[in-house]
């Protein structure tokens, strides 16, 4: 409640990206206090086994909040059952020009066109090697803007090789709306080529490192039933270990006429909830248990998390809900999940 009633009003007076950077800095500083960290909280244990990994609870941080792995220890102290960092690209890139992150508070939403701004995979690995965190860490990888879609496999392969020794699972981000052409990798021959190449690469990395790291595919909410079935078929055919549903949406349903709603970029938060949950349900129907689903999109309460599980998800991730509600959201979901 301290966050929602005191800190959030102060942060929301700032530019969204400045507030984001300040929040991460505060979490980093708090983590250095160890047991005296005033933000530290423990959630009830609600173990889940997904992708062959043991999760202490099913509540994760979605990729995008800590793109560079700069705040792993600070975020871990909040009670997450797992963290996903990134999206990271092989080479550093600045992303799109500012402003590129916008709040739509009347709708509990954000619009972002960040454009995979990150410090590159070498920086992220250095941060991961420094962390004290020993929980489940996912690393989300993407392609550089300057790499054409036809050569996307090169970037994903390079990213996978680099992060493989340090990740509990690796997410292939093929669904951001802010990198031109990226979403085409979700379909047809481009998806088959990408997955075929990366599954072959994983076989070699498994032999090299003596461990098999699961691969998850993060997908968009803006797919029709035919596209969802085709994607599910590719997931099963290539042996993808999980699907993360979903990324942000290009739709503006539910935010029409609101300030910043028409900004270019992906929409996240409450307006995404129904659309993303429907994708979870359709994927669950198409997959028939052959790959687990990690739900992401519009989770603002314990009831929202339960709805994702009922739709067929095994785990949930939060981002925009966490921006609006802070650590109290995790505590609420933890209580509700423990009571199931």
Curated annotation (Swiss-Prot):
One of its GO terms (biological process) is 'de novo' pyrimidine nucleobase biosynthetic process. Binds 1 FMN per subunit. Pathway: Pyrimidine metabolism; UMP biosynthesis via de novo pathway; orotate from (S)-dihydroorotate (quinone route): step 1/1. FMN binds at residues 63-67, 87, 140, 173, 218, 246, 269, 298, 319-320. CDD domains: DHOD_2_like. Catalyzes the conversion of dihydroorotate to orotate with quinone as electron acceptor. Monomer. HAMAP family: DHO_dh_type2. This is Dihydroorotate dehydrogenase (quinone). It comes from Methylococcus capsulatus (strain ATCC 33009 / NCIMB 11132 / Bath). The gene is pyrD.
């Amino acid at each position: 409640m301290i966050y929602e009633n005191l800190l959030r009003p102060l942060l929301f007076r700032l530019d969204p990206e400045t507030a984001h950077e300040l929040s991460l800095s505060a979490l980093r500083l708090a983590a250095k206090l160890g047991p005296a960290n005033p933000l530290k909280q423990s959630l009830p244990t609600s173990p889940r086994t997904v992708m062959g990994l043991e999760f202490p609870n099913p509540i994760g941080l979605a990729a995008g909040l800590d793109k560079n792995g700069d705040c792993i220890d600070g975020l871990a102290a909040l009670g997450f059952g797992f963290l996903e960092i990134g999206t990271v690209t092989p080479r550093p890139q600045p992303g799109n020009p500012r402003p590129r992150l916008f709040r739509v508070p009347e709708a509990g939403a954000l619009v972002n066109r960040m454009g995979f701004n990150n410090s590159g995979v070498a920086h992220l690995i250095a941060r991961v090697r420094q962390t004290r965190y020993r929980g489940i860490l996912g690393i989300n990888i993407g392609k550089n803007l300057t790499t054409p879609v036809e050569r996307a496999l090169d970037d994903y392969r390079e990213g996978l090789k680099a992060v493989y020794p340090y990740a509990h699972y690796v997410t292939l981000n093929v669904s951001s709306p802010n990198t031109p052409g990226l979403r085409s990798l979700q379909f047809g021959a481009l998806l088959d080529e990408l997955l075929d190449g990366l599954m072959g690469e994983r076989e070699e990395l498994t032999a090299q490192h003596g461990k098999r790291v699961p691969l998850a595919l993060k997908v968009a909410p803006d797919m029709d039933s035919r596209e969802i079935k085709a994607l599910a078929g590719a997931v099963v055919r290539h042996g993808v270990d999980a699907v993360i549903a979903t990324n942000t949406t290009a739709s503006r349903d539910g935010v029409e006429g609101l300030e910043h709603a028409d900004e270019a970029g992906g929409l996240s938060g409450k307006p995404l909830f129904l659309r993303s949950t429907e994708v979870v349900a359709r994927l669950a129907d198409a997959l028939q248990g052959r790959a687990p689903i990690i739900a992401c999109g519009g989770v603002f309460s314990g009831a929202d998390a339960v709805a994702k599980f009922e739709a067929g998800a095994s785990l949930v991730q939060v981002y925009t809900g966490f921006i609006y509600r802070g650590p109290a959201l995790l505590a609420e979901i933890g209580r509700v999940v423990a009571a199931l």
